Swiss-Prot record:
SUPFAM superfamilies: NAD(P)-binding Rossmann-fold domains, Winged helix' DNA-binding domain. It comes from Caldicellulosiruptor saccharolyticus (strain ATCC 43494 / DSM 8903 / Tp8T 6331). The gene is rex. This is Redox-sensing transcriptional repressor Rex. Gene3D superfamilies: NAD(P)-binding Rossmann-like Domain, Winged helix-like DNA-binding domain superfamily/Winged helix DNA-binding domain. One of its GO terms (cellular component) is cytoplasm.
Length: 219
């Protein structure tokens, strides 16, 4: 598959949204869509849609638009969802348990293969038929099972320590839900998820709406 080097992160972050929408089109038996229709429904410009897809070869045909099936298959490959990445969760508190029970991981091709914690009240119990193991077993488990992704749901004060254990075990990517900005070697990919950041963005948008109403009422 053709792919430009150094695709911007902004483009990459739009790809899951494209995939969700195209999947919905297929579920409604819509087999073709133009860039203008796609852009209108998603809130982007047609030029933006074409530029995004051109980073990976384009996928469209002039005068025809996009085959939703072809678009879906290409987006799945671009996002690596055909790789069936193996995933573990470290820290089985409220967030870790919620993620462990999230069925969409399986639907999108991610395989949860391990759960880890230090709490003796949790170790030995199971979630979705996956036994919670003590963190002392983490490194060996990663090595033996060739785990790809480690999900970090531990307290921030131990985040770097646990990340180090993951890396020593041979983890390839870390999905970091802690407030700590962890440091890892260059060949390990990190995606930080700060839930409060998204809430603050919502707060900003809500505040803007309130200010607009206040200004309108004063005119």
């Amino acid at each position: 598959m053709f792919k430009k080097k150094n695709v911007s992160l902004a483009v990459v972050r739009r790809l899951p949204r494209y995939l969700r929408y195209v999947e919905d089109l297929l579920n409604h038996d819509i087999m073709r869509i133009s860039s203008s229709e796609l852009s209108q429904r998603m809130g982007y410009t047609a030029s933006q849609v074409r530029q995004d897809f051109n980073n990976f070869g384009g996928f469209g045909q002039q005068g025809y638009g996009y085959s939703t099936q072809v678009l879906y298959e290409n987006l799945v490959k671009i996002l690596g969802l055909d790789k069936n990445f193996k995933m573990i969760i470290v820290g089985v508190g409220n967030l870790g348990q919620a993620l462990a029970n999230y069925a969409n991981f399986y639907k999108k091709g991610f395989r949860l293969v391990g759960l880890f914690d230090v709490d003796p009240q949790k170790v030995g119990k199971s979630i979705r038929n996956i036994k919670i193991q003590h963190i002392d077993e983490l490194k060996d488990f990663i090595k033996k099972n060739d785990v790809d992704i480690g999900v970090l749901c531990v307290p921030s004060e131990v985040a770097q320590e646990v990340a180090n254990l993951m890396v020593e075990g041979g983890i390839k990517g870390i999905w970091n839900f802690t407030a700590k900005e962890i440091e890892v070697k260059d060949d390990v990919v990190v995606e930080n998820v700060h839930l409060i950041d998204s809430l603050m963005v919502l707060s900003y948008k809500l505040n803007e709406k309130l200010l607009e109403k206040q200004e309108a009422s004063q005119k």
